[in-house]
Amino acid sequence: MDVASLISPSESDTVPTFRSRSIQNSSASHYKRLSEQSTGSYFSAVPTHTTSYSRTPQPPLSPPAEDQSKCSLPSISILLENADGAAAHAAKRQRNSLSTHRDSDPRPPYDSITPHAMPPTPPLRPGSGFHSNGHSPSTSSVSAASSSALMKNTESYPQAPIGLPSPTDRSSISSQGSVQHAASAPYASPAPSVSSFSSPIEPSTPSTAAYYQRNPAPNTFQNPSPFPQTSTASLPSPGHQQMISPVTPAWQHHHYFPPSSSTSYQQNHDRYICRTCHKAFSRPSSLRIHSHSHTGEKPFRCTHAGCGKAFSVRSNMKRHERGCHTGRPVATAMVQ
C-alpha cells in the first residue's frame, strides 16, 4: 500500500501541481495583458501629443517676424563686408597686375632712358663749361638734364608710382657719377689751373649754393658739385666766405662782380655808401670819384698849353691826352 502510493501518485498530489501551473499561466497572461494595455495606452497617448505639438507652431505669427528681423540685419552687414572684401580684392588684384607688369617690362624703358641721362657730361669740358660765364651753365645743364630724366621716367610709368624712386635714384646717381668722373679727369694733373680759376670762381658761388639747396641729399652721392676735388678744397664754403672775402683783395676787384650778383654781395663788399644817393661801393677811391659827380668837382686838369680842360676822373684825362695831344707827356697837375 505504501509502495503503491509512492509509485503512483494520488489525485491530491496531481491537482495542486496542475493548479499551480494554471495559476502561473493565468498570472503570465494577466501580466501580458497588462503590458499590452500599458503599451497600447502609451502608443495611443503619443499621437495625441504629436498632434498637439504639430498644432503649437501655427497660432503665434510673431516668431517668423522676429526671424525675418534677425536675418535682415546680418544681411546688411554681410553686404557691407562683401563690398569691402570685393574692393580689397580688386585693389590686391590691381597691385598684383602692376607688380607683374613692372617685373615684365622695366628693362626696355630703362635702357632707353639711360642714354638720355648721359648727355650732361659734354658741357663740363674745359672748352664749354669752365671758360664760359662762371660754372652756372654747367650746373644748370646738369639740373635740367636730371629734371628731364625724371619727367621721362614719370611719363613712361604713370601707373606705378611706388616703383619710381628706385630707377630715378639709379639714373640720377649714375648721371652724377659720370659727371663727376668726366669733371675730375681733365683737371686731375694740372694743379696751376686751379689757381688760374680762383678769381672767376667767386661769382659762381651763388649758383653752387643754389645747387646745394636744390639737392639736399648728401647720402646719395658724396660730391654733388661738378668741380674737381682740388678746386672744391681750395674754395671756401658759402657760410665761411662771408668772413674771409673782405680780407682777400684779389676777389674784391670790381671787374669780377657781374651786375646780376652785385646785390648779393652788397653787405660784404659794398661797404662804402654815398651819403647823397646811398649808392654802395667796394673801395673808398670809387666812392670819392662818385662824390665828384654830386659836387661837380673836376680835380684833374689837362696841362697842355691852350687846353685847360678839367676832368673828375683821371682815366678820362688820360684818354683826352692820348686822343687830342700826341706830343710829349706832361706831368699831371691835380687841383686841390
UniProtKB/Swiss-Prot annotation:
This protein's UniProt keywords? Metal-binding, Nucleus, Repeat, Transcription, Transcription regulation, Virulence, Zinc, Zinc-finger
State any GO BP term from the record: regulation of gene expression
Q: What is the protein's major site of localization? A: nucleus
**One GO cellular component term noted in the UniProt record for this chain:** nucleus
Q: Mark out the compositionally biased spans (Polar residues).
A: 7-29, 36-56, 168-181, 216-245
Q: Where is the composition biased (Low complexity)?
A: 136-149, 182-210
Q: Recorded GO terms, molecular function?
A: zinc ion binding
Q: Name one Pfam family in it.
A: zf-C2H2
Q: Could you say which residue ranges form the zinc fingers (C2H2-type)?
A: 272-294, 300-325
Q: Cross-referenced PROSITE patterns, in alphabetical order?
A: ZINC_FINGER_C2H2_1, ZINC_FINGER_C2H2_2
Enumerate the Gene3D superfamilies for this protein.
Classic Zinc Finger (3.30.160.60)
Q: Which stretches does the entry tag as region Disordered?
A: 1-245
| SUPFAM superfamilies registered for this protein in UniProt | beta-beta-alpha zinc fingers (SSF57667)
InterPro entries, sorted: Zinc_finger (IPR050331), Znf_C2H2_sf (IPR036236), Znf_C2H2_type (IPR013087)
Traits of the deletion mutant = Leads to a reduction of protease activity and a decreased virulence in a G.mellonella infection model.
State the compartments where it is located. Nucleus
Per the entry, what this protein does is: Transcription factor that controls morphogenesis and virulence. Acts as a positive regulator of gliotixin and protease production.
Protein name per the record: C2H2 finger domain transcription factor mtfA
Q: Please tell me the species this chain comes from.
A: Aspergillus fumigatus (strain CBS 144.89 / FGSC A1163 / CEA10)
